[in-house]
A protein has these predicted regions:
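Glycine-rich phosphate-binding loops of nucleotide-dependent enzymes
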Residues: 1-169
Length: 169
């Protein structure tokens, strides 16, 4: 969750702090190395905001952003940690179709340009099919299928579970 009373920039900087080398002593004494590191955090955060198309909101409070921009900010903060794997749990929930399309483009861009693996948990099947190389389908806590989007789209167990159609035995 976002920190609603912090700015967009501050929210991303929070994600970046896990990569800092200076500890409590550095925060208190503020040697040149700590100040240099803090400047780098700010610069890195601006770079991330530009990639997420959020730079226009840099000084805006997170709570004042449109819902789709808040979702992008959550992803921006996660990306600030320099992850190898980005876990997205229903990132399209509550988004309108236009915002979902923008999210689709953003996740593809992150996957391809930032070379981050994306683990997506999502009910929007159009988004899942668009983004995924491999899909694991779970129904009531049990894996019922796995495969490529094409294989999943035509899988009788998936069709039955999600569309309610009968499987011919």
């Amino acid at each position: 969750r976002l920190f609603p009373s912090m700015t967009v920039l501050e929210n991303v900087m929070v994600g970046r702090h896990c990569r800092l080398k200076s500890g409590i002593a550095g925060a208190i004494l503020r040697p040149p190395s700590t100040r240099k590191e803090e400047r780098k955090v700010v610069a890195d955060s601006y770079r991330i905001l530009e990639k997420m198309d959020l730079e226009k909101f840099v000084n805006e409070y997170a709570q004042n952003l449109p819902y789709g921009a808040q979702r992008r900010l959550e992803i921006a903060r996660a990306m600030a940690t320099d992850p190898f794997i980005l876990l997205l749990d229903e990132p399209a929930a509550g988004l309108n179709p236009s915002e979902t399309d923008e999210l689709d483009e953003l996740i593809l861009k992150l996957r391809d340009q930032e070379e981050v693996t994306v683990l997506l948990i999502e009910h929007d099947m159009k988004l899942v099919m668009s983004l995924s190389d491999r899909i694991f389908v779970v129904d009531y806590g049990k894996k019922i299928a796995q495969g490529t989007p094409k294989e999943i789209k035509n899988n009788p167990a998936v069709i039955k579970a999600y569309l309610g159609e009968e499987i011919d035995a």
